[in-house]
A protein has these predicted regions:
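Histidine-acidic metal/acid-base catalytic patches
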Residues: 1-6, 11-31, 69, 96, ...
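N-terminal small/glycine-rich loop or linker at the start of catalytic domains
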Residues: 1-9, 76-86, 120-125
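Active-site-proximal loop/turn and secondary-structure-junction residues that shape catalytic pockets
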Residues: 11-13, 37-39, 81-84, 120-122, ...
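Aromatic/hydrophobic pocket-lining residues that form π-stacking "cages" and hydrophobic walls in ligand
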Residues: 21, 64, 102, 144, ...
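Short beta-strand segments at enzyme active-site cores
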Residues: 33-35, 75-80, 112-119, 153-159, ...
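Glycine-rich, proline-tolerant flexible connector loops at the mouths of alpha/beta enzymes
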Residues: 34-63
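Short glycine-enriched, charge-decorated loop/helix-capping segments at active-site entrances
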Residues: 47-54, 91-92, 130-131, 241-246
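Active-site acidic/histidine proton-transfer and metal-coordination neighborhood
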Residues: 69-70, 85-199, 206
Length: 302
């Protein structure tokens, strides 16, 4: 089995631009990338390509796809919106519109999945109304999954941890609430084929403080619905997005769980590449790629 190593390049895109970030990813040895669609992508901004219509979006992202292909880089997934619905009508409507364009850009890039965040306690408080949270979740995903279907991609909902502003578990960091929200959409025939899960190991690791499963057991319990990853490590308290094996996560158990569910996707990392400073991001990313390759080599011998 050819196991691909990927890395999220949002920070590189912000510092160096989209095209240069792809070149850097290739140079440091990545097989694949998680491509950010968040940087200056808002249809309400005249400076954004999203404000110029789908022809302009297609032209721009087609060139990026050509660049990635020429470098031998797989754009496996994109990162879309990170706020979820806030129960603020104007902002929620804008979120849907921008997600529609994210789905279109994802397809143009040749990626299979666009990762998004659900509604969060970060914006709605430490003890939000459960009915409201599930309504916001259902309303968001039921409105955006048709765009995924139209573009032949999938929307991935990302696992959560704590709500850092409040020293509380994020509402959908509670595993049972996450599953309930996921199933509410997944059980609908017209949505099920275009909805999936991204496990963020660091987020799930922070949720264990609130009696939630370990990241490995999150993977086991979600099973084959896990199709994309944000692999990162932390101390279980802070959302550090550290390189695997530099925090407290049991990585042998993570790989055991991935094997048990038959995971065959990209081993994609989402890291704080600025941990050692913005001037050291490339070196940090390169080391992370080497670490993941060595982990895979030691485990699988390939």
């Amino acid at each position: 089995m050819n196991r691909l190593v990927g890395i999220a390049i949002g920070r590189l895109q912000k510092k160096y631009g989209d095209f240069k970030a792809l070149e850097i990813a290739s140079k440091i040895g990545a097989d694949a990338v998680d491509f950010s669609l968040l940087i200056n992508n808002d249809y309400r901004s005249s400076d954004s390509v999203y404000s110029k219509g789908k022809d302009a979006i297609a032209e721009y992202y087609s060139k990026l796809k050509e660049k990635a292909d020429s470098l031998g880089i797989v754009i496996n997934q994109t990162h879309g919106r990170i706020t979820g619905f806030k129960n603020i009508k104007s902002q929620d409507e804008a979120l849907v519109k921008n997600t529609e364009l994210d789905c279109f850009a994802t397809a143009v890039l040749g990626a299979k999945t666009c990762v998004v965040h659900n509604a969060s306690s970060i914006f709605l408080g430490p003890n939000p109304d459960p009915q409201l949270m599930h309504k916001l979740s259902f309303d968001y995903f039921s409105q955006i999954i048709p765009f995924a279907k139209e573009n032949n991609i999938k929307i991935a909902t990302e696992t959560f941890g704590d709500a850092v502003k409040y020293s509380a578990c994020d509402f959908f960091g509670d595993f049972d609430e996450f599953v309930k929200a996921y199933k509410a959409i997944k059980d609908i025939d017209e949505f099920k084929d275009n909805f999936t899960i991204c496990v963020d190991t660091g987020h799930s690791n922070k949720a264990i403080r609130y009696n939630n499963p370990t990241p490995a057991n999150v993977i086991r319990r979600l099973g084959e619905d896990v199709t994309v990853l944000h692999l990162n490590d932390n101390d279980s308290i802070t959302d550090q997005h550290k390189i695997p094996m530099t925090g407290m996560i049991d990585w042998d158990d993570i790989f055991d769980a991935l094997d048990e569910i038959g995971y065959n996707g990209v081993y994609n990392m989402e890291l704080n590449l600025s941990h050692f400073g913005d001037n050291f991001m490339i070196e940090t990313a390169e080391f992370a790629i080497k670490v993941m390759r060595n982990m895979l080599l030691n485990r699988y011998g390939e």
